[in-house]
A protein has these predicted regions:
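Surface-exposed amphipathic alpha-helices with a cationic face
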Residues: 45, 163-167, 243
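Short pre-catalytic strand/loop immediately N-terminal to key active-site residues, enriched for Gly-Thr
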Residues: 4, 103, 183, 219-227
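Short, glycine/polar-rich helix-capping loops at beta-to-alpha or helix-loop-helix junctions
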Residues: 36, 133-139, 201-210
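Structured adenosyl-cofactor binding patch, chiefly the S-adenosyl-L-methionine
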Residues: 14, 120, 141-147, 209-250
Length: 250
């Protein structure tokens, strides 16, 4: 059965997960037979959905029924695009691609703020991971001030592989990190993608090695005990600089 974005019951959830439709979260009741729980966990991971174990009473409250059969799925808040869709959007506008990639941004408020800046600075879309980062939830949409519903979002299984594909298509990939080159010393025109790392550990070393360049934001007051910008603030600064350089290039 389905109530708006909530699908519950063993067969409906199984069919939804196998269909490839966007699913953000699968809830599995505590106490479900281990083999059955493992089956739905495997299906959910294959579909790129987050799995949460919850008390049966909570599942009843969230589905509005006792007939949930121990499992429910929550559909994605938006229709996700593909990376190819994002590149095609740039081509349709006659512009070099300008993409933002999340390498594990976890806080939905940060992701929403990044999306807002990306839209206002002219990015053609944002790429987020299926696992290991925030997906587009109601909190993200609210934090983005509506940008999440206007900015194309692609969700991929592997950010590293996506970077490789973008580079093959002539996109120059930068990431933001403290040991990079000062922001304004970089040429940020042309086909470009900016990778932003997680709040705790930043861009992963594997992803960093794949990037063509690393940009750094300088600080006017070093030694204060505050050693970095919030990821959404850093994103806004870098994205504005990219927008400015691209405007001059035109």
């Amino acid at each position: 059965m389905c109530i708006r974005d909530r699908i519950y019951g063993k067969n409906p959830v199984t069919e939804l997960l196998k269909s490839g439709s966007g699913v953000d979260t699968v809830l599995i009741a505590e106490g479900m037979a281990p083999a059955v729980a493992a089956y739905y966990t495997a299906l959910a991971k294959e579909a790129g959905a987050t799995v949460k174990r919850v008390h049966p009473n909570k599942l009843r409250l969230m589905t509005g029924t006792e007939s949930h059969q121990g499992v429910a799925a929550f559909a994605s808040e938006i229709e996700y695009a593909t990376v190819e869709d994002l590149l095609a959007a740039a081509k349709a506008k006659g512009e070099p691609p300008f993409l933002v990639l999340s390498d594990g941004i976890e806080d939905p408020h940060n992701l929403g703020a990044v999306m807002r800046s990306a839209l206002l600075c002219g990015a053609h879309g944002i790429v987020i991971p299926k696992r290991g980062g925030a997906s587009v939830t109601p909190t993200v949409i609210k934090s983005s001030a509506g940008a999440a519903e206007r900015l194309p979002v692609a969700r991929v299984a592997n950010i590293g592989e996506t970077i490789r594909r973008l580079k093959e298509q002539g996109v120059f990939v930068y990431c933001a990190d403290m040991d990079g080159v000062s922001l304004r010393k970089n040429n940020l025109t042309g086909p470009i993608a900016l990778v932003l790392g997680s709040e705790g550990s930043g861009v992963s070393q594997l992803v960093k090695k794949l990037c063509d360049g690393v940009v750094r934001l300088d600080m006017a007051a070093p030694g204060t005990g505050v050693d970095s910008y919030n990821v959404s603030v850093a994103a806004g600064i870098i994205l504005y600089e990219i927008q400015s350089q691209r405007a001059v290039e035109e």
